[in-house]
Amino acid sequence: MHYVPFHALYDGFNYAIENREIAYAPGAGVLQNCLRKPRRPFEKALFVGVSDERIPFVGEETKTLARLFPNSITLLDASANFGELTKHTSDIDVLHLACHGQFRAENPLFSSLKLFDRWLTVRDVDSLKLNADLVVLSACETGVSRIAPGDELLGLARGFFSAGASSLVLSLWNVHDQTTVELMKCFYREIYAGKSLAAALRRAQCEIMKKCPHPFFWSPFFLVGRW
């Protein structure tokens, strides 16, 4: 059940996300920790992007989203390295990473995100002094996890929740680069307008659905944790 995109379920007339806001619980204990933390306004954001020939729109995504936050930091390509990342993670409300991602089924703790100089693994994330309430992993397969005894998720989600995040936006499969840019623009515009995370993601998905009806394009991302 962990891999079912409930927001993309279709009843023959509509997809579930068209009629309701949907968020996913990471597990009772983790969710309790997420909901216990006081809410903060999303004022300071860190946008990190590493592009290449397979994901050429990452630069546009990173720079466009950063302009929505007057108090933001952008690390793009060469500056998006592990050292620079660790300088800023303790003093932000939002962390957005746009890059390549990979899930390691044989060892989920080595699932990772591609920075400019190295892969950022789950073990690395555990050691970050992360102060961001919202973490968006705009990459492939960032929401895929292995289910351990006790319904514990082993993967990137576990790392970022352990590091202190309250809400994660993750992906279930390989995402379409250009469509992801448009979805993220709409998502952050809705947040900036005061919408809840669940409402913002729903609006973004419905907007993409109008242009690209197939669920492959609009439904890979889902919200986990506080909504």
Where are these regions (language model features)?
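Catalytic cores of enzymes
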Residues: 1-227
